Amino acid sequence: MSHEELNKQLEPFKLMVFDEGTEDVWATLVLWLNEDYKQNVFDTREEEGFVGNGYDWNALATVFLEEKMPELMEVLSFDSEAGMFAIGSEDVEAVKQFALGFKALCDDESEMTDLFSRATLD
């Protein structure tokens, strides 16, 4: 599957691969938080301080990795900011695997809400 096809499947997330074909290749999955994508899930814990920013997405992704893809915990790293969720690695296939699984989670709002109920505020 091409990067273009994969990105269509991952919308509104975007997978970016840098320096492809070199030993310095790396990839990152990004979600710019300029829309209300899944904000209702984060609103379920608003009273606890969750607002749906990049750090809150990190908290959700951490629970997802711990419970669904623990083998990727050591190879992925977060680089989020308040207005952006980002996770990446030099292991492009690991980022793709995470991206597909995490997007599937987001498409299942009840499972997403369940996992988010175990997230810890950073």
Where do the language-model regions lie?
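Structured alpha/beta or helical-core interaction and ligand-binding surfaces enriched in interleaved
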Residues: 1-84, 89-97, 104-122
